[in-house]
Swiss-Prot record:
One of its GO terms (biological process) is proteolysis. This is Serine protease Do-like HtrB. It is a single-pass membrane protein. It comes from Bacillus subtilis (strain 168). Induction: Induced by heat shock during exponential growth and by heterologous amylases at the transition phase of the growth cycle. Negatively regulates its own expression. Belongs to the peptidase S1C family. It is an enzyme of class 3 (hydrolase).
Length: 458
């Protein structure tokens, strides 16, 4: 199934940011390349390209499916760009569009977890029209402006010009003195040379990118607080129940349809989907809703019956024969990431420092004859192609041609499992155990995790 972000720029390909330099363009570092991405990963970029070509309203919402190509040479590090077909990211290229918002009925008594968020429910939430009117000032449209090179004859030089690459939505969650802050999706702002924000009253502000995180697909923007009169209240997504009514407010297909409201229910909780990002394929925990989510909705809020934000709209299934499958990032997952982005401009994560290939991609004869595996050892874990110098993996004693079968006590079947454990269960500075198979023998190694950098793999 193809998952795509609601709003995404056309310019950024979903390749891992830790791509091995000497490899071909479609090769990925193991840390970010998973070949058999369970049900084919959702691609932010796929969504961009689709919404770009799909600017002809709903008809063009059919997801552009990218077929994952399997390389004949299994030794190539994980294929770059396994993109499933059908998940659409809500960025509308050129035309602003980002309406993937659903309403959530989160508990009005949510405990305050951060000073950056307010939690009071809207007093007039019993009437949807009144609630929407109250929330409208907190919803914004976001335009991603990028520079393109004009070189008609390919002779070098030429001129450059700025153009709108894509649009999305966002929600104002904090006002501090003369500044206001907006939550949106990373794929809405990725690659921008300039970001502009359109407020509910039509006023336009130039926005500053405070921080963004590819893995969670979240970003925080800063604008002048001069024209900001209200901030959105956040609810407790852990209190949601399937069947609760929700609404989505956003800008499907651009500012032309700004402030569009759609209604639905929470169709499912704690859904896990694979998403192909510039950091590789990652698993996302999302809320499922049947509220209409169209290109341009990405980054907009999903709102409960109390008028509180319980999710940030991010993805929808765009596949022939499939309707009303939209996904939002739960508010309880959003808040801690936003806190880090406000404080540091980024999210620090641990890494091992290895390039890997899923064992499902390694020929059985190679597993037996070269790696020395046998019996139930065959086909398990991830193959270590290369170990980075001075990395936690090297210091722990991991070697090329080892097969990692457990990390932090959990079974490993794919590189996605490695990332999931690293990003969800562990943090920088943690000590952990790694179980490997080496020439048919099991070894348990100890590693101390360090900070992931732009040039480091998983």
């Amino acid at each position: 199934m193809d998952y795509r972000r609601d709003g995404q720029n056309d310019q950024h390909q979903t390749e891992p940011s830790h791509t091995e330099q000497q490899n071909t363009e479609n090769q990925k570092l193991i840390g970010h390349s998973e070949q058999e991405l369970l049900d084919a990963p959702v691609s932010y970029e796929a969504g961009r390209q689709e919404t770009a070509s799909a600017l002809e309203m709903e008809k063009q919402e059919t997801a552009v499916k990218k077929e994952k190509k399997r390389r004949a040479a299994w030794l190539s590090p994980i294929l770059g760009g396994i993109i499933g077909g059908g998940l659409m990211l809500g960025i509308a290229p050129y035309l602003p569009s980002d309406q993937n918002q659903a309403t959530e009925t989160a508990s009005a008594n949510k405990q305050v977890q951060s000073d950056n968020f307010t939690t009071a429910p809207i007093t007039n939430a019993s009437n949807i029209a009144d609630m929407v009117e109250d929330l409208e000032p907190t919803i914004v449209g976001i335009s991603n402006i990028q520079t393109s090179q004009n070189n008609t004859f390919g002779t070098g030089g030429g001129s450059s010009s700025e153009s709108e690459s894509g649009t999305g939505s966002g929600v104002i969650f904090k006002k501090d003195s003369d500044k206001a802050y907006i939550i949106t999706n990373n794929h809405v702002v990725e690659g921008a040379n300039k970001l502009t924000v359109t407020l509910y009253n039509g006023e336009t502000e130039t926005a500053k990118l405070v921080g963004s995180d590819t893995i969670t697909d979240l970003a925080v923007l800063e604008i002048s607080g001069k024209n900001v009169k209200k901030v959105a209240s956040f609810g407790d997504s852990s209190q949601l129940r399937t069947g609760e009514k929700v609404i989505a407010i956003g800008n499907p297909l651009g500012q032309q349809f700004s402030g569009t409201v759609t209604q639905g229910i929470i169709s499912g909780l704690n859904r896990t989907i694979d998403v192909d990002t510039t950091q590789g394929t990652v698993e996302m925990n999302v809320l499922q809703t049947d509220a209409a989510i169209n290109p341009g909705n990405s980054g907009g809020p999903l709102i409960n019956a109390s008028g509180q934000v319980i999710g940030i709209n991010s993805l929808k299934v765009s596949e022939s024969g499939v309707e009303s499958l939209g996904f939002a990032i739960p508010s309880n997952d959003v808040e801690p990431i936003v806190d880090q982005l406000l404080q540091n401009g980024k999210v620090d994560r641990p890494f091992l420092g290895v390039q890997m290939i899923d064992m499902s991609q390694v020929p059985e004869t190679y597993q037996e004859n070269t790696l020395g595996l046998f019996g139930d050892q065959l086909g398990k874990g991830v193959y270590v192609k290369e170990v980075q110098a001075n990395s936690p993996a090297e210091k722990a004693g991991i070697k090329s041609e080892d097969v990692i079968v457990k990390l932090n006590g959990k079974d490993v079947e794919s590189s996605a499992d490695i990332r999931q454990i690293l990003y969800k269960d562990l943090k920088v500075g943690d000590k952990t155990t790694i179980q490997v198979l080496r020439k048919g023998k099991t070894k348990t190694l100890n590693a101390t995790l360090t900070k992931q950098t732009e040039s480091s793999s998983s």
